[in-house]
Amino acid sequence: MDSQRTVELTNPRGRSKERGDSGGKQKNSMGRKIANDAISESKQGVMGASTYIADKIKVTINFNF
């Protein structure tokens, strides 16, 4: 639960600030491809686990708890 909560808190920040401006709709469809920032990648950890190397590391650490 902690892992999800942590990622959720990061979600609105990176999404509303940077990604939201670019196009939040496209990110929902192809978020894995559009995600370039560490914030977006960490958020994708919940949806597309093990999509990016950095994403996988963050997911592993969070899920480890």
Curated annotation (Swiss-Prot):
Residues 1-41 are annotated as: Disordered. Coiled coil: none annotated. Keywords: RNA-binding, Transport, Viral movement protein. Residues 17-43 are annotated as: RNA-binding. GO terms for biological process: transport of virus in host, cell to cell. InterPro entries: Tombusvirus_movement. Residues 15-24 have a biased composition (Basic and acidic residues). One of its GO terms (molecular function) is RNA binding. The keyword RNA-binding applies. Belongs to the carmovirus double gene block protein 1 family. Homodimer. Cell-to-cell movement. Displays RNA-binding activity. This is Double gene block protein 1. It comes from Melon necrotic spot virus. The lineage of its organism: Viruses, Riboviria, Orthornavirae, Kitrinoviricota, Tolucaviricetes.
